[in-house]
């Protein structure tokens, strides 16, 4: 049985479309509001946090590596997240109790590549860009 095609079927077509929208993953995520509640950033693109500890996350098979990450407690809501530290040796620029700026890591709330459960990356440390520190253009402020 196909869809209604006659005259006076507009109400039926419209209500059917309204019902079927909710079976679309993206529509449901955007309109229910539960994804926004579950998101540690609360809809923002970036968030500041305090480094709790440095952790090594093992890469998924078939890769074999320890990806350098940090546990961060967000200032705005106190939620704890794991954030990836990009580039070689950048973990040395980060100490515990540092203030870091964290951003998303690519796939709209999903983990990236072979790093399981890590959905965020570190962008700034003590208000200095991690990339600038890595390239040697800037130095960490002495405190």
UniProtKB/Swiss-Prot annotation:
Residues covered by region (Disordered): 1-26
One GO BP annotation of this record: maintenance of translational fidelity
Keywords associated with the record: Acetylation, Cytoplasm, Deafness, Disease variant, Dwarfism, Endoplasmic reticulum, Hydroxylation, Isopeptide bond, Nucleus, Ribonucleoprotein, Ribosomal protein, Ubl conjugation
This protein's record includes keyword Cell inner membrane: no
Pfam assignment, any one: Ribosom_S12_S23
Basic residues bias: start-end ranges: 1-20
GO CC terms in record: cytoplasm; cytosol; cytosolic ribosome; cytosolic small ribosomal subunit; endoplasmic reticulum; membrane; nucleolus; nucleoplasm
Record annotation: effect of changing residue 120 to I: In BTDD; decreases hydroxylation of the protein; decreases the accuracy of translation; decreases levels of incorporation of the mutant protein into polysomes; patient cells become highly sensitive to oxidative stress
Compartment annotation: Cytoplasm, Cytosol; Cytoplasm; Rough endoplasmic reticulum; Nucleus, Nucleolus
Name of the protein described by the UniProt record: Small ribosomal subunit protein uS12
Highest classification ranks of the organism: Eukaryota, Metazoa, Chordata, Craniata, Vertebrata
């Amino acid at each position: 049985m196909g869809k209604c095609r006659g005259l006076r079927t507009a109400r039926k077509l419209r209500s059917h479309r309204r019902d079927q929208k909710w079976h679309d993953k993206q529509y449901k995520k955007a309109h229910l509001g539960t994804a926004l509640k579950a998101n540690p950033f609360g809809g923002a693109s970036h968030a500041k946090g305090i480094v709790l500890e440095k952790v090594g996350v093992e890469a998924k098979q078939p890769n074999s590596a320890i990806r350098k990450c940090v546990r961060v407690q967000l200032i705005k809501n106190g939620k704890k997240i794991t954030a990836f530290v990009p580039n070689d040796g950048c973990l040395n620029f980060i100490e515990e109790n540092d203030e870091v700026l964290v951003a998303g890591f690519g796939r709209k709330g999903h983990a990236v590549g072979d790093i399981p459960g890590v959905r965020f990356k570190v962008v700034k440390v003590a208000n200095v860009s991690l990339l600038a520190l890595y390239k040697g253009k800037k130095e960490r402020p002495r405190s």
